[in-house]
Amino acid sequence: MPYLLMASHNPLPAGKQLLLLVLLCAFFSSSFIPFASCSITDDLQTQCLKVSATEFAGSLKDTIDAVQQVASILSQFANAFGDFRLANAISDCLDLLDFSADELNWSLSASQNQKGKNNSTGKLSSDLRTWLSAALVNQDTCSNGFEGTNSIVQGLISAGLGQVTSLVQELLTQVHPNSNQQGPNGQIPSWVKTKDRKLLQADGVSVDAIVAQDGTGNFTNVTDAVLAAPDYSMRRYVIYIKRGTYKENVEIKKKKWNLMMIGDGMDATIISGNRSFVDGWTTFRSATFAVSGRGFIARDITFENTAGPEKHQAVALRSDSDLSVFYRCNIRGYQDTLYTHTMRQFYRDCKISGTVDFIFGDATVVFQNCQILAKKGLPNQKNSITAQGRKDPNEPTGISIQFCNITADSDLEAASVNSTPTYLGRPWKLYSRTVIMQSFLSNVIRPEGWLEWNGDFALNSLFYGEYMNYGPGAGLGSRVKWPGYQVFNESTQAKNYTVAQFIEGNLWLPSTGVKYTAEFGV
């Protein structure tokens, strides 16, 4: 029975090495199956694809087969190690390959049935490019997880991951980047229930489960509440988390669709963890809170990682949730605080704090009306607010920051903003893309604005833009002179990075009830 919640204000053995090598060599010397045919409407081909619909479906099936075969080989070594970090890296890869298989299957399903329930926005070209981009980045994340390990495994699987990457990159070239196809009548997809549309704005919210440390709810920890939630739910399932500090690492797996979590306020309901790279966790697995199920919403909650700056990569929140919303949430840590890993995401009225690359990943994400706070780093360290991870020019991904306040946190203010030089971002990958617009930049931002990653890497291919920012850190006279950096002089240039255009917000944000500005109005 639902409850009513009032709105809150507040080293592998030699034998196994040989087996793995033989299996991988056998797989990668084999040929792929020929294209399979399927029945897809001519509309799909003319509006969304640059190749025949049959060829596109066949390419998807080939890529799915490649992913599954790599995963099958790697799974034989899942429990073969005593090395904690290596075991985590393999576990990550298996999960990430599983993500990729799902994303490719969604693409296949949606392209064959444009009105199916698995379609998210109803705008097929946007959905396909989003899911294919996610499938692309997963292989990179898998490889990155082997940093700090000494194992033959990384070298052996790199060929397989590279082959999957090439196949997905080819698929991305087959989808039109700017299709004229619209969602159903330009409105909210038909599968979204009307009663789900105002959950964030209602005075009362009907909840399905309550988490309370004092035993007054259905569960005393968040993880148990998540496990009890239905799989693949087509309606919103609401979990209310009462005030308190919940010291646990929460993972919302990919089958948990349309979960919503509501706390008693960002300073009242806190989910806290301390995993870090130094302690043997991969960056991906270090997250205090990780969500992969599509359609996730969080409101009035703090997600924190307390590992501290000396522990290096330590994620507070990681999202792979397509069409996810974080509203009035506090996301705090130091290095790598917020991992916007993949998919389409929206953050509104949030507080995000950290040091090095503290907003990073390869999602398509917009931040509106957020406080972005640079903290005091380690001695001789430089802060970079963003580190966007776009590796292919056909990806629609990037970071857009609009109507936000970018300032120093209290610890950096107390030490002097000059003690830790702070920059708007640096290019993690070759086609890194970040836009800052209509935001207040305090004197914490260095006059150069942006920071190199490693020499001249990506300076020609990145895309960094600024538009109508203000404040002592917004001066443009001393900004970097990189070929990939530009200042927008016209709104027509900046419009591409608004909620309406960049994340197709008008097609799905109304279903969440969250406040948002579609373009440039305050």
UniProtKB/Swiss-Prot annotation:
Keyword annotations from UniProtKB, A to Z: Aspartyl esterase, Cell wall, Cell wall biogenesis/degradation, Disulfide bond, Glycoprotein, Hydrolase, Secreted, Signal
Pfam families given in the database record: Pectinesterase, PMEI
Glycosylation sites: 105, 118-119, 218, 221, 274, 405, 489, 496
Domain of life: Eukaryota
EC number: 3.1.1.11
Residues with site note (Transition state stabilizer): 335
Disulfide bonds: 350-370
Enzyme active site: 336, 357
Protein name (Swiss-Prot/TrEMBL): Pectinesterase/pectinesterase inhibitor PPE8B
Species this chain originates from: Prunus persica
Taxonomic classification: Eukaryota, Viridiplantae, Streptophyta, Embryophyta, Tracheophyta
